[in-house]
Every structure is written in structure tokens, then in C-alpha cells.
From Swiss-Prot:
Removes the formyl group from the N-terminal Met of newly synthesized proteins. Requires at least a dipeptide for an efficient rate of reaction. N-terminal L-methionine is a prerequisite for activity but the enzyme has broad specificity at other positions. It catalyses: N-terminal N-formyl-L-methionyl-[peptide] + H2O = N-terminal L-methionyl-[peptide] + formate. It is an enzyme of class 3 (hydrolase). Keywords: Hydrolase, Iron, Metal-binding, Protein biosynthesis. Its EC number is 3.5.1.88. This is Peptide deformylase 1.
Length: 217
């Protein structure tokens, strides 16, 4: 459980309830875009500031918003809320032939997440962000990490993640520190989603894009 002395922040709880209501019956919240100050602010650690009921509603609304976008992760900052929590989920078939090492990543609520690399191996692939809508860029990330987080019940988790699930976890955790993926991306690789589909999707390894657009892998 979260801290024994944790108390619900009544003002914050009311604000979050109002935020949830803006999603309507569809439970769809607007996703804030790059340039909004909240995306650049370090979040406050979650320690029970919301009632269990409000937290459950927030998680449900974030999950619905993420899936509808569609995306595989959504941080609280992306809906304008400066708390250290995010939701992640990617239902894909494991593909041993895909160099991105894509694998099933079941739904998780990750609260106060952190990660550490467990090897010096990195991988560079295109990735995108719901708060930098319409574009993707090549970002180098750790291939293997130890991921740590609390779930919605306050239980602590520590698990190894590899490949694409590790990339998703790093992306969402970085959001909660005020970082966007584009901050450390290969800027010359930046492309619209349409151009990515037209030019660079045939091979997930962006070797040709690096040669044509002039960036290093």
C-alpha cells in the first residue's frame, strides 16, 4: 500500500474528478501537445493523494483515451496532470524475426516508475508520441532494463524488460521527468507518419533512412 500517513488531497481530488468529467461518457480526454508547460515539468510522486475511487476512474479514463488515440502508453502529463503515473499496453504477437523484438506487453498501471539498464546494449528505431502527433523519429534506447513501479494498489514491482516493451516503459517513464522522446532523437530522422509509411517502413532497421536523411545509427 501507499504510505500509511498518506492523505487524500481534497483539492487535487476535486480537480481530477473535474478532469475526468471532461471526457464525457466516452471517457476520452484531449491529449496535450508539445509546447504545453506540463509536459516539461517533473511530476510529483504519487502517494495516495487521490481517493481509491477517483484513482480507479482516472486509470480507466486514461486507458480508454490511450486505446482510442491509438497508442501503447499514456502518461498523466499528457492529459495535463502532474502526477507520476502512466498506463501501458501493447497487444501484438511475438515476432522473433522483427529486429525491434516486439512482444506482448499486457496492461499495466505504472506509478512512480523508474528504470536502470542491465547491459550496455542499445537499439535505434523509429518511435512516435501522442503528444508530438503526426511525426516519428529514430531514438536510441536501452535494450534491456530493470523496470520498477508501484501498481494501483500500492504493490511494488521490479521486473526485467527487453526489446519493445522496454522501449515503451522508458518512453512513458521519461514523460514523468519532463522529457519528450524527441529531446534525444536523431533530429535529421524526423518524418511525418505519411512519409515514414511511404519511404522507411519496409525495413524496421532505419539503415536506409540514415543514409538518405543524413544521420548516424
Amino acid at each position: 500500500m501507499f504510505g500509511k500517513n498518506a492523505k487524500v488531497d481534497l483539492e487535487l481530488n476535486r480537480d481530477v474528478e473535474q478532469l475526468i468529467k471532461t471526457g464525457g461518457k466516452e471517457k476520452l480526454l484531449p491529449i496535450v501537445q508539445a509546447g504545453e508547460p506540463v509536459l516539461r515539468q517533473r511530476t510529483v510522486a504519487y502517494n495516495g493523494q487521490l481517493s481509491k475511487r477517483t484513482l480507479a476512474k482516472l486509470i480507466d479514463t486514461m486507458h480508454t483515451t490511450m486505446l482510442e488515440a491509438p497508442g501503447v502508453g499514456l502518461a498523466a502529463t499528457q492529459i495535463g496532470l502532474g502526477l507520476a503515473l502512466a498506463v501501458v499496453e501493447d497487444h501484438v504477437r511475438d515476432d522473433e524475426d522483427d529486429p525491434r523484438e516486439i512482444a506482448e506487453f499486457p496492461f499495466h498501471v505504472i506509478i512512480n516508475p523508474s528504470y536502470k539498464p542491465t547491459s550496455d546494449k542499445t537499439a535505434s528505431f523509429y518511435e512516435g508520441c501522442l503528444s508530438f502527433d503526426g511525426y516519428q523519429a529514430v531514438r536510441k534506447r536501452w535494450l534491456d532494463i530493470t523496470a520498477e513501479w508501484d501498481d494501483e494498489d500500492g504493490k511494488h514491482h521490479s521486473e526485467p524488460l527487453h526489446g519493445w516493451p522496454a522501449r515503451i516503459f522508458q518512453h512513458e517513464t521519461d514523460h514523468l521527468s519532463g522529457e519528450l522522446y524527441i529531446d534525444r532523437a536523431e533530429i535529421r530522422s524526423l518524418t511525418t507518419n505519411e512519409n515514414l509509411e511511404d519511404y522507411w517502413c519496409e525495413d524496421p532497421v532505419p539503415t536506409e533512412a540514415a543514409e538518405e536523411l543524413g544521420f548516424a545509427l
